[in-house]
Structures are given as structure tokens and as C-alpha cells.
Amino acid sequence: MRWTKEELDRYHRQMILPQVGPEGQERLKRASVVVVGAGGLGVPVLQYLVAAGVGRVGVVEMDRVEVSNLHRQVLYTTEDVGEPKALVAQKRLQALNPLVRVEAYPVRLTSENALEILRPYDLVVDASDNFPTRYLVNDAAVLLGKPLVFGAIYQFDGQVAVFHHPTLHGEMGPCYRCLFPKPPPPGAVPSCAEAGVFGVLPAVVGSLMAAEALKVLLGIGKPLAGHLLLYDALEASFRKLTVRRNPRCPVCGDEPTQRELVDYEAFCGLR
């Protein structure tokens, strides 16, 4: 593949890595990723995927920018308050790297539109902040046969995993439901608005999520398939747990019983 001077100048320090090279950079250029959520976690994921040269990146986010977002969602500014996050993110990301294509979906992801929105992309990233969306994104990714990079944060703690992707041993790794078959009771886990979040935590966890996404796209290293990575910002410590696919999982098991998307608000006991 022939590279333009702008591409070589922009990606040179990534392309000289032996694990990437021109072939890996071409893989990124041809790849597509959709990120569900353009908040604390989604912002660093989007920034690093776009900067790395992933050819097509989708942004799914229904919320508008709020002042309370700005201590951790550094893609947005005070002037953006009240504007749709997806559209602001699209504009800023396109300015960051005009060589890639950024697609905005300023809508709520639902059982009715999830398959249509996620289907065109190679990889799905779940940067959402609520349980109905997490189960929805997981189930949609499994039904579509897409790998899923997952992240979550709470106060000073973060989690990262790669779901529905082969492990180093060759078997298919677990999905989100294999780890969490049932959601917690409504109100049992406070939101960031209720419990708070350390401002830099989303940047750390989101960057780890971006790294996992790039590893999967490039086919390098050891993606977190079959593992759950735990980060404690107060202790500056990491733990990596081994997790396995549940052969009886209703979505990704040997004989799945759920072959379509459901009402996830009802599934999570929210109505």
C-alpha cells in the first residue's frame, strides 16, 4: 500500500514498532470500531482510536454536555454545555485526525436499533454507564459475532475486559453475562452522579480499553479475553482475574436460549 506524506508523518512513530509496521497500520486504516458512550470512558477511547488511525469510528451517545461532565470528559469545553455530545465529539475527533471517518449517532441505543447501528463495525466498545445498556450491548455483540471491549468505573476503581473473543488457548472467551448473569437490584449500585468518580480515573481505564481495542484489531499481544483487569487508583495497583465462558450462558453458551434482543429496562428491574 502506498502512503501519503501526511500519513507517514502522522503515524511514523507507531509504524516503526515491529509489532505494527506498515501492515498493521493498514489493518487499522481498514478497520472500524463503534463506541457506545461518549462520556468519561468513551472520550479517551475515541481520542486514541482516532489518533491511531482506525479508519472508521462510530460514536453512539444520546446525552448533551453538562458542566458536571467537564472535570473528567476533557474532549468538551464550557462552550459546549447543552450541545449533543455525539456531534461535538464528531467535530473534535475529525479535527484531531481528518484522515479517518467519524460517524455520530446522537440517539439512545435500544433493542430496536442496536443491531442496525452496531452491525457495520468490526469491533464494539462498551463505554456506557448503566446496566441496561451493558446487557444490551453485550447481547447485540454476541448475536452479531463481534468482539466487545468493556470498561467500567466506580469512585476510584476500574474494570476492563475483552468479551466474546478467542483466548490465548484458542477457545472462545466469556461474554459479560458469563460474569454477571443477573443485574444487581435497582439502586444497589450508585451511579457516578450519586457516588462520585475520581476525575482522572476514566482516562486511565479508557486508555486501557483503547489499548485492548487496538491489540484486537492488530492481532498482537495478549488481549484481555478470558480475563478481568481490576485497577485501584488509591493503591496504584492492578489485579487480573481469570474468567471463563459459561457453557450454559443463555446468550453465548453451547445451546443459547436467547436469540434476540429483549427489553433491558425490564430485565434490570427498572420497570
Curated annotation (Swiss-Prot):
Gene3D superfamilies listed in its UniProt record: NAD(P)-binding Rossmann-like Domain
Post-translational modification summary for this protein: Conjugated to TtuB via a covalent linkage that likely involves a lysine residue. Is able to form a covalent thioester adduct with TtuB via Cys-192 in vitro.
Catalytic function, reaction form: [molybdopterin-synthase sulfur-carrier protein]-C-terminal Gly-Gly + ATP + H(+) = [molybdopterin-synthase sulfur-carrier protein]-C-terminal Gly-Gly-AMP + diphosphate; [ThiS sulfur-carrier protein]-C-terminal Gly-Gly + ATP + H(+) = [ThiS sulfur-carrier protein]-C-terminal Gly-Gly-AMP + diphosphate; [TtuB sulfur-carrier protein]-C-terminal Gly-Gly + ATP + H(+) = [TtuB sulfur-carrier protein]-C-terminal Gly-Gly-AMP + diphosphate
Cofactor annotation comment: Binds 1 zinc ion per subunit.
An annotated Gene Ontology molecular function: thiosulfate-cyanide sulfurtransferase activity
Residues engaged in binding Zn(2+): 175, 178, 249, 252
Catalytic activity, EC: 2.7.7.80, 2.7.7.73, 2.7.7.-
Highest taxon above the source species: Bacteria
Entry annotated with the keyword Transferase: yes
Top EC class for this record: transferase
InterPro entries per the UniProt record, alphabetical: ThiF/MoeB/HesA (IPR045886), ThiF_NAD_FAD-bd (IPR000594), Ubiquitin-activating_enz (IPR035985)
GO CC, one annotated term: cytosol
CDD domains listed in its UniProt record: ThiF_MoeB_HesA_family
Disruption phenotype: Disruption of this gene completely abolishes the presence of m(5)s(2)U in tRNAs, although its precursor, 5-methyluridine (ribothymidine) is present; other nucleoside modifications remain unchanged. These deletion mutants exhibit a temperature-sensitive phenotype similar to the ttuA and ttuB deletion mutants, they are unable to grow above 80 degrees Celsius. They are also unable to synthesize thiamine and molybdenum cofactor. No TtuB-protein conjugate is formed and only free TtuB is detected in the ttuC deletion strain.
Pfam families assigned to the protein according to its UniProt record, in alphabetical order: ThiF
Binding site for ATP: 13, 40, 61, 72, 85, 109, 129-133
Function: Adenylyltransferase involved in the biosynthesis of several sulfur compounds. Is required for the 2-thiolation of 5-methyluridine residue at position 54 in the T loop of tRNAs, leading to 5-methyl-2-thiouridine (m(5)s(2)U or s(2)T). This modification allows thermal stabilization of tRNAs in thermophilic microorganisms, and is essential for cell growth at high temperatures. TtuC catalyzes the adenylation by ATP of the carboxyl group of the C-terminal glycine of sulfur carrier protein TtuB.
Family, similarity comment: Belongs to the HesA/MoeB/ThiF family.
Protein name: Sulfur carrier protein adenylyltransferase
Organism: Thermus thermophilus (strain ATCC BAA-163 / DSM 7039 / HB27)
